[in-house]
Amino acid sequence: MRSRVGDVDESVSTDEPSGLRSDQDVALRRALLYVILPLWFVPGIADWVWHRQTKIERTAGTFESLTHLLMKTSVGIPIILTLFFDINALVITSMMLGSVVHEGISFLDVQYADGRREVSPIEQHTHSLLEMMPFMATLVVVCLEPRQFASIFRLGSERPRWKLEAKRPAISLQYRVGLLCAVALFVIAPYTEEFVRCLRIDDTLKPHRTPES
């Protein structure tokens, strides 16, 4: 029977998301789970700080803040899928599309902010990191399941799997809870706060009252 990433390797802790084919797979998984994903929070929270320092609510305003929420969503959903479901054609495609959508919204974000809000060199470097992270994560996932990636383009002998399949064995509960808590604390909370702060000041989105005659 074919050995694949989803098969169980009893020599490896269940902290790993699924079975392993080689030491390279172990290294790739650990790079994704313990390096790429945790480090992703650093430029994310730094970018929020730069927005706050330049008073986004009084400059570029609600529209730019909305693009930030859309970018987080475009890559957040595929990442969540990789934590709970086997890596297959569906998950890989969602990550690729999410990365492309994130890049497109990022371009729109910078284009809109230009001339409305000061974007310092350090913020530009922060943006570069944020744009690179989704593609890095996607590349690691593709390397872990190259046959499913190839099957998307009708290459190789493996059929693409286009349904969500629960991970066997699952990533440890502690890791998933910890990462989701970090997402809530360092992504959802600050960027929701930013959006609400912009809404409170943006008069264009408030309902206009008809003057009483």
What are these regions (language model features)?
Residues 92-162:
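Membrane-proximal helix-loop-helix units in multi-pass membrane proteins
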Residues 41-50, 99-113, 182-197:
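Transmembrane alpha-helical segments that form the membrane-embedded catalytic/substrate-channel core
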Residues 69-82, 129-139:
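Core segments of transmembrane alpha-helices
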Residues 45-65, 198-202:
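Membrane-interface helix-loop junction between the first two transmembrane segments
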Residues 1-26, 30, 196-213:
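Transit-peptide-like, low-complexity N-terminal presequences
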Residues 166-213:
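A hydrophobic membrane-anchoring alpha-helix module
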Residues 9-34, 78-93, 140-159, 166-174:
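Helix-coil boundary and interhelical linker segments in multi-pass alpha-helical membrane proteins
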Residues 57-70, 120-125:
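Juxtamembrane helix-capping/reentrant segments at transmembrane boundaries
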